[in-house]
Amino acid sequence: IVLQNEHIYILDKKQATIFIFTHNGKYQNKIANQGRAPGEYLSISDFEVYDSHVYCLSRTNQKIFKYDTNGVFQNTIQVNDWYDCFHIQNDSTIYLFSDYSNNQLYNYVVYNPITKEIINRLDKFKKNQGFSFEYSPFHCLDSNLLVSEQYEHTIFSLTSQEKKPLYSFIFNTSDQIPPFIYTDREKTYHFLQGKETLRRIKGLYISQGTLNIVYSIFYKNSGIK
């Protein structure tokens, strides 16, 4: 869900459709262009609203599709790899994210859509694991871009030059994250079924100078909370 310019944008991944509502909940329009023709996508993995346009990332197509708020296709940005999520920082900087599952073998790729060049690659891994949790790690806090990843107890700051630890938290859960978290995501997923551990830090916001986090933990007696 994205709230911007007095509008509410909601992605329905199953229908590959973005529904657009006014700020008071009145339906206004939708972007529903699933298909194989020019300007159509096979799926929507993630979307962003930037500069009064809607950008839709399709992992399957390896493209970002740009539409106006009436659903009229504008153009595409070819990203040429498997990415789950993205963040548009400005006109010349897009952060692309893949959870250990692309051929670049970097979790973060910084791309300039104007020059069509890769600015930098960050957070290297050894093997394309082909397994995705389908979440966005990106959080914009004031003028800073922060990221939180699946099972990670640490929040990182991200720039085009580096990813570095910023905050770390201790969660008193009865089970621990296994050491193979970074080398085998699918094995980690199955190993942690039914175990009491952090799943993900899902949201960040600052109130009266205090950092607040929203997170999910699986509890053995009550499920994910």
Predicted regions and their residues:
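Eukaryotic scaffold repeat domains enriched in small/polar residues
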Residues: 1-225
